[in-house]
Amino acid sequence: VVVLLLLGLTLIQSYRQYFIAWAQDAKTYEAYNEGSVAIANYLISGKHNDTKYYIVMGGYEANPIQYLTHNKLEYKLLDEKQLKDLPLDQGKILVIVPAGNNHDAQLLDLKAKFPAGTISDIRSNINGKLLFSAFESK
């Protein structure tokens, strides 16, 4: 009986530690690509037929976005050189610039190329940290 009681208490404590304390830690959201999930949700929720979508990202880090937007949305992944070479005559565009080392410089490049564009910063609901910026041309 004592062993069963100890086993039951251990299960309760493990449940609380894993599903309550650990799951609500802000670092958990960073570790599990909160930014990528937020980008995918942002793109899907604001989908417009006349807009071309771009994400300044490549390789492995884009996998969660590709998975979450599969068959829901078309976009192109860009590296920094491709971002600078974006043509001016393509209509309305939305460029997602993830937070990171070159975030500010990439936004400056976009603003210089498309001066009428607007920037929206998207922050984490958990810790308020910048996740990405959405640049929209007019």
Predicted regions and their residues:
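Membrane-proximal, lumen/periplasm-facing interface regions of secretory-pathway glyco-
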Residues: 2-51, 55-78, 125-129
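Aromatic/acidic, Gly/Pro-rich catalytic loop(s) in extracytoplasmic/lumenal soluble domains
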Residues: 81-138
